[in-house]
Amino acid sequence: MTKQERQLKIKELISGQTVSSQYELLSELKSVGIEITQATLSRDCAELGIVRMYSGDSYKLSIPASGEKNVIKNLIGVEILSIQANEIFVIIKTLPGRASGVASFIDSFENPMIIGTLAGDDTVMVIPKTIKETKKVHQFIRNSISDN
């Protein structure tokens, strides 16, 4: 199975039923004969722009339409508690359980100054491409979550 076929199946599963987590999505993929690792699924979700959104009474994985980016931007802004940088990394503190969604939002910009993000429960580490770009990445993130 090619990457494109796998990602198409992921889109179908997410749009066709309520899937609340990557773990649940991994189980759904396995039930239709697609065996992949959690790391591969995580990369696929980031590439597809999949985010975990609250929908009334529970969370669900979703692929937002391009017009929904501003709605997500506003939600992300509420979830971020602080943004700090040292010489090497940008660290974002979030509400508990929201770091993954914030990291996915940052990844969705596909900014060439950012190699990637690493999310825990309430902390996101943003890794700039070079140390010289850390301040620019810090400012980019601030601008990405603010209307100012």
From Swiss-Prot:
Where is it localised?
Cytoplasm
Question: SUPFAM superfamilies per the record?
Answer: C-terminal domain of arginine repressor, Winged helix' DNA-binding domain
Which GO molecular function entries does the Swiss-Prot or TrEMBL record give? Answer: arginine binding; DNA binding; DNA-binding transcription factor activity
GO BP annotations of the record are:
L-arginine biosynthetic process; protein complex oligomerization; regulation of arginine biosynthetic process
Q: Is the keyword Repressor in the record?
A: yes
Which pathway, metabolic or otherwise, does it act in? Amino-acid biosynthesis; L-arginine biosynthesis [regulation]
Query: Which Gene Ontology cellular component terms are annotated?
Result: cytoplasm
Q: Which family does it belong to?
A: Belongs to the ArgR family.
Name it. Answer: Arginine repressor
Please name the source species: Chloroherpeton thalassium (strain ATCC 35110 / GB-78)
Its gene is argR
